[in-house]
Regions:
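Hydrophobic core segments of alpha-helical transmembrane domains in multi-pass membrane transport
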Residues: 17-31, 79, 131-134, 160-165, ...
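Inter-helical junctions in multi-pass inner-membrane proteins, predominant
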Residues: 35-40, 54-64, 211, 217, ...
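Alpha-helical transmembrane segments within multi-pass membrane transporters and channels
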Residues: 113-159, 303
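Helix-loop-helix "hairpin" substructures at the membrane interface of multi-pass membrane proteins
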Residues: 125, 137, 192-267
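Transmembrane alpha-helical segments in multi-pass inner-membrane proteins
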Residues: 252, 263, 267-329
Length: 361
């Protein structure tokens, strides 16, 4: 195998963009730590630390990234399928997260109760109730996009605007606290490992196995590439698009439960805030085209944790939480620009010209 073929394979690797982005974030952390006189490799250090609430746990920046980035990773699974099938995005996932968290905590605490340590209903009822609301929201979005042919961004803008308000109504404009050990488990630790990361890993594994063991992944990509041709070939394009939005709502519900459990409360104003942007950015950073079609779930997951690594790095560099979205928006613009057909065609022409020139020489 010659050097040219190796370079070609690297250039065509679908995980090139997320892996390079992650390596760049690591490099920035190493340089920053060295500049302030800290251990340049402190970013990679993982230790055991004793805590009052969770006992002995794994501690370190990488562990924090894996823990804090789990909700976005869960959202990125559903967002990847939505983008692939409909060439659109679900901008309601952050608000749906908030609504699911509010409904779950309202069930667990009891309507009108602002704080409790005892559960009004069994824990499983509250958890499934919150997830069910997410599924309903996904079905609502899927119906508008697939059957009413409304543009995805416009269709999901409805719940983007309304879901948080509905959550506030359910909680009587209050932050509902559920200070219960069983409920807090989902935002805590299993042994030394963050529970949120375990839940995210299970969601990723189950989805990956489902897509690989069935033809569903191929069907979704086919619908995203050409819905008319897929319909002629016998696929129900509308049903496939409806299903992906429903699944996206399901994962938004799971992410909402994890987020609420992490803070043992339903804060409708803040849970899932800007998470839709992070989920979309994860898909784009994962090397997936926002124009639909072929997708890489692994790329989206790497992209999700890269986004969290970027967020952690920005905070370490002194960027405030209100300024961080500006930097993320710049990254989105750059990624979308790189994926733009005219720019990609330009680079292909340059590459072809170099090959012709090399052959002539």
């Amino acid at each position: 195998m010659n050097n040219k073929s190796v370079l070609t394979r690297i250039k065509n690797w679908n995980l090139l963009l997320p892996v390079v982005s992650l390596l760049l974030v690591m490099a920035v952390n190493i340089i920053h730590d060295a500049a302030i006189g800290a251990n340049p490799l402190s970013f990679f250090m993982i230790t055991l630390r004793q805590t009052t609430g969770n006992g002995t746990i794994l501690y370190g920046r990488i562990i924090d990234i894996l823990n804090r980035g789990s909700e976005v990773a869960i959202l990125a699974i559903g967002m990847t399928l939505v983008v692939s099938s409909s060439a659109g995005t679900d901008i309601s996932v952050g608000s749906v997260m908030s609504l699911c968290a509010s409904f779950c905590c309202m069930l667990l605490a009891g309507y009108g109760v602002s704080s409790t340590t005892t559960l009004a209903v069994p824990l499983i009822v509250g958890i499934l109730g919150g997830i069910f609301i997410g599924v309903l929201c996904g079905m609502f979005n899927g119906t508008l996009v697939a059957y009413f042919h409304i543009q995805p961004m416009v269709a999901t803008l409805i719940l983007f605007s309304a879901a948080r308000a509905i959550g506030l109504l359910l909680c009587n404009d209050l932050i509902v606290y559920v200070r219960n050990e069983a409920f807090g488990f989902f935002g805590g630790y299993i042994g030394v490992i963050p529970t949120a990361f375990v839940i995210a890993a299970l969601c990723i594994i189950v989805t990956s196995l489902f897509l690989k063991k069935t033809a569903m992944g191929m069907y979704i990509q086919s619908v995203g590439i050409n819905p008319k041709a897929s319909r002629i070939a016998g696929l129900n394009s509308k049903r496939m698009i409806f299903m992906t939005y429903t699944v996206c709502g399901l994962f938004a519900g799971i992410a909402g439960i994890v987020a609420a459990s992490r803070i043992t409360s339903a804060d409708s104003n803040n849970i899932g805030l800007y998470f839709e942007m992070d989920a979309i950015l994860s898909v784009a950073l994962g090397g997936n085209s926002l124009g639909g079609g072929k997708f890489s779930l692994a790329g989206s997951i790497i992209g999700a944790y890269t986004i969290q690594a970027i967020t952690t790095t920005l905070y370490a560099l002194g960027v405030s939480s209100t300024q961080a979205p500006v930097f993320k928006a710049i990254i989105v613009i750059l990624i979308v620009a790189i994926q733009a057909p005219p720019l990609r065609a330009f680079f292909k022409r340059r590459s072809a010209a170099k090959q012709v020139k090399g052959a002539a020489a």
